[in-house]
Regions:
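A structural signal for conserved, well-ordered secondary-structure elements
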Residues: 1-612
Length: 612
């Protein structure tokens, strides 16, 4: 790189950082397109819409309720990966969708889940909603004319596959109508016998129409018929002060990392700080561009990818130092340092990207949100480390900063004989791992739970209170939360406001009848609340057993995929097995910490485990 090119690269870098800073702070146009304030945030950060449905009929079975909760969760992920669905009482289901303020629009888009039937021309029901495994709108191309066709791709259950094969064989060249709540929404003609459990419904005029029909079919595949009971807009679960403090802490952390890199690596440290600034700006812009929903687990994914971006720079600059110490010129050391570091950086990021891809494809809820933000962060961190950092280091060299002192001097370090002390370290590891069953056993004997499961895992009690005065979320945190904690002894309390009212929703661990009465009396005494304006219902966990199963299966498959990649990459199964064993060791140590400290195990616990 010539001097003029180096100057141009540095100028463009300053311009890029300024442009990213302007975009994230202000954005473009009247709506501030691209700004950080336009990033979708979850219920914990900005609130959203809450819709409660009631099951029609008497005494729905728990199995049907669980199945309906799970399928609704999959349905509302079209709006946000961070949407929550949970059972309330015996026959109600609540859907909470973050980042939305128009409840009517969601109700219109989501529709009212009702009954779905496939009927032949005689009106006989050949399939119903329980036979549908999935439905998606898509586009295909006519093999003859080359024109686009908008279709709905149907996937049937095992029983549905058998029924549909028989129905299509008996109704060739006849219509099978799709009837939703008594209304015919489509009447496709059977063109052939369909025996593989997959079918297409053609004839839609646009992709939007195809997606709408697919949405209706998915909703109609619920086992229960539901009717809307109530809907409202709820506020954030975290106060502005908590969010502000978190942002300040994050900014301070980035600055400290930049300062540390500069102190340790000199000029390359400056490059690392600039690359980190570009990475952060690109991350915020891309969150906007891909319309991702940001929550606390999502932030954990971003923090992990920032750490990986810094790690990549450390690997590169340590290599450059080693090459200079070995007697190579600065120019040669830069070239060799990047070349030698690339394989380690790429391998480390690809294994993490494999895990993110599997978790994103198979997980749901916060696990899926974590995976998507992590995958985005990994791609950006590789780009900034291998492209931006390389350009900047070469640019600084080209403008005349060529002295070895600018690139940090390799210091003599005392070698620690880890292998020689392996018995000591193995002993420490075994003790830490044994603390897992010990800590979980003690906890289980104490309160019947191996870990301190939060609302997301165990469910609890939802108390609706209408206060006499409007209270901000910060007021609720400082005044109401301590009162609730005093009665319940629960540190894991979620409080959210209902928009345009004085109503507040308080979620705690499951409360007995006596505890509910004590809490009601405490709220009456402390805030003068009318006792008739306090209601309480039991709620299920937002992480259903099916979602937990999906997450566990996803983690296992991700682990196997990483094993296979490492085995393929290094041609030795010992490397793969060692990497996974080290990973399991770290997981067990963190699990021991959670078991002994009794820190709440919820979505943040999932994020913490996934960052390992």
């Amino acid at each position: 790189m010539k001097k003029k090119q180096g100057v141009l690269v540095l100028i463009l870098t300053v311009v890029l950082i300024g442009l990213l800073a302007f975009t994230t702070a202000v954005g473009f146009g009247p709506t501030g397109t691209g700004s950080a304030k336009n990033i979708k945030t979850g219920l914990d950060l900005s609130g959203g819409v809450s819709i409660t449905y009631q099951a029609k009929g008497d005494d729905p079975s728990q199995e049907d309720m669980d199945d309906t909760v799970y399928k609704l969760q999959k349905r509302v992920e079209d709006y946000s990966e961070e949407a929550q669905v949970y059972q309330e009482g015996d026959d109600r289901i609540t859907v909470e969708i973050p980042g939305v303020t128009d409840a009517n629009k969601i109700l219109e888009d989501l529709g009212k889940p009702g009954s779905l039937e496939f009927q032949d021309e005689s009106g006989n029901v050949v399939l119903d909603g329980s036979d549908i495994a999935g439905a998606d709108g898509g586009v295909t191309e006519d093999q003859t004319t080359g024109s686009k066709q908008y279709v709905v791709e149907l996937t049937l259950t095992k029983d549905g596959t058998t029924k549909f094969a028989e129905a299509t064989a008996a109704n060739l060249k006849k219509r099978i109508s799709i009837v939703y709540d008594g209304e015919t929404i489509s009447s496709p003609v059977v063109q052939s016998v369909i025996s593989d459990g997959k079918a297409q419904i053609s004839g839609q005029q646009s992709i939007e129409e195809a997606k709408e029909l697919a949405s209706i079919i998915r909703i109609g595949s619920l086992k229960l018929e539901l009717e809307e009971l109530r809907s409202n807009v709820v506020g954030a679960q975290l106060g502005q002060q908590a969010i502000k403090t978190s942002l300040i802490a994050g900014a301070i952390g980035l600055v400290l990392v930049g300062i540390f890199m500069i102190i340790v690596y000199a000029l390359p440290g400056v490059v690392a700080a600039l690359s980190l600034a570009i990475y952060t700006g690109l991350e915020l812009v891309m969150l906007n561009a891909f319309d991702l929903t940001l929550t606390l687990p999502g932030i954990a994914g971003i923090i992990l990818s920032i750490g990986m971006a810094v790690d990549a720079n450390v690997i590169i600059y340590a290599r450059i130092r080693e090459e200079i110490a070995a007697g190579k010129s600065v120019r040669s050391a830069i070239k060799t340092g990047f070349e030698k570091a690339m394989s380690a950086i790429v391998d480390g990021n690809i294994t993490t990207l494999i895990a993110a891809a599997v978790l994103g494809a198979m997980g749901s809820g916060s696990v899926k949100g974590f995976a998507m933000t992590l995958a985005l962060g990994i791609v950006l961190s590789m780009f900034t480390a291998l492209v931006i950092s390389r350009l900047l280091v070469n640019a600084f060299y080209a403008v005349g900063l060529r002295d070895e002192k600018f690139y940090g001097k390799q210091k003599e370090r005392k070698t620690i004989d880890f292998l020689g002390k392996r018995k000591l370290f193995f002993t420490i590891s075994v003790i830490l791992i044994l603390l897992v069953p010990v800590g979980m056993g003690v906890s289980h004997a104490k309160d019947g739970k191996a870990l301190n499961y939060s609302l997301e895992f165990m469910g609890g009690t939802s108390t609706n209170v209408t206060f006499n005065d409007d209270m901000s979320i910060d007021d609720l945190d400082s005044q109401v939360k301590p009162v609730v904690q005093e009665v319940t002894g629960d540190a894991n309390i979620q409080i959210s406001k209902v928009a345009d009212s004085n109503a507040v929703i308080i979620k705690t661990r499951s409360l007995s009848l006596d505890e509910r009465e004590e809490l009601n009396q405490k709220l009456v005494d402390s805030f003068g609340v009318d006792d008739s304006k306090i209601t309480a219902e039991s709620i299920s966990s937002t992480v259903s057993s099916e979602m937990r199963r999906d997450a566990i299966v996803a983690v296992l498959i991700a682990t196997i995929c990483m094993l296979l990649y490492i085995w393929f990459r290094f041609k030795d199964v010992r490397f793969a097995s060692s990497a996974v064993l080290a990973l399991l060791h770290d997981v067990m140590v963190v699990l021991a910490f959670y078991a002994l400290s009794r820190i709440s195990v919820g979505n943040t616990f999932i994020a913490c485990m996934l960052t390992i």
